[in-house]
Amino acid sequence: MAKKDGNQEEEISQMEEGNIHSASNSDSNVGFCSSVSVVVILQKLIAEAIGTYFVIFAGCGSVAVNKIYGSVTFPGICVTWGLIVMVMVYTVGYISGAHFNPAVTITFSIFGRFPWKQVPLYIIAQLMGSILASGTLALLFDVTPQAYFGTVPVGSNGQSLAIEIIISFLLMFVISGVATDDRAIGQVAGIAVGMTITLNVFVAGPISGASMNPARSIGPAIVKHVYTGLWVYVVGPIIGTLAGAFVYNLIRSTDKPLRELAKSASSLRS
């Protein structure tokens, strides 16, 4: 019994890491593996949907309230976005990884940090969370075209695309550093990511709306039927996050050889 329990714990651990394999060919173990894997994946999807819901509800809600009542101010909007992301990272990060962003999920999978087979499920959960949050805001407030809380390019599409790529690059560069590097202090990941989003909204908010997240733009667009420049907020964040992760991994990949060279130099001097 102890051995069986140990095998089950090992299987659960593998499932949580996205490596779902059956350690036994027996029908009982296969059934256990299947049932637990479904539960684990459902937990992750629910966490992503809830996390994305509150990110969009608070962030877009601050935009709507400011446009309707004028009481939040632009700095308040920036801080709200950063705070809600930070809070939700610490709340469900240990369950789902706290992506809340299809571009981040796709990038993690391309760089081997997330299983491909879960990507469509994560994206669906994120979009559902965004759509539900946008629908909630539309029911709570009289959202006129002037009070639209989605993202629409203020200038040209090219300008908004460029700035979305840049700020998404910065966001993923920071995420790669604080959430995937073993040398980083994991406890500060939420703070670092939240502050990065706050800074990005300060810089890019007046130009593109500082989406950095296809789900953040798609949800309000579907609910309010505003599709102007929507492609910018799908293409830009994906390109930016891929580039940010690539550059960070390029820098990190040179770290080990440099340390080995330093050790060799030290041994020669001694």
Swiss-Prot record:
It holds the Pfam family MIP. Keywords: Membrane, Repeat, Transmembrane, Transmembrane helix, Transport. GO terms for cellular component: membrane. It is found in: Membrane. Its main location: membrane. Pollen specific. A motif (NPA 2) lies at residues 213-215. CDD domains: MIP. The keyword Transmembrane helix applies. InterPro entries: Aquaporin-like, Aquaporin_transptr, MIP, MIP_CS. It comes from the Eukaryota. The chain crosses the membrane at residues 45-65, 72-92, 121-141, 160-180, 188-208, 231-251. A motif (NPA 1) lies at residues 101-103. Aquaporins contain two tandem repeats each containing three membrane-spanning domains and a pore-forming loop with the signature motif Asn-Pro-Ala (NPA). NCBIfam families: MIP. Belongs to the MIP/aquaporin (TC 1.A.8) family. NIP (TC 1.A.8.12) subfamily. This is Probable aquaporin NIP-type.
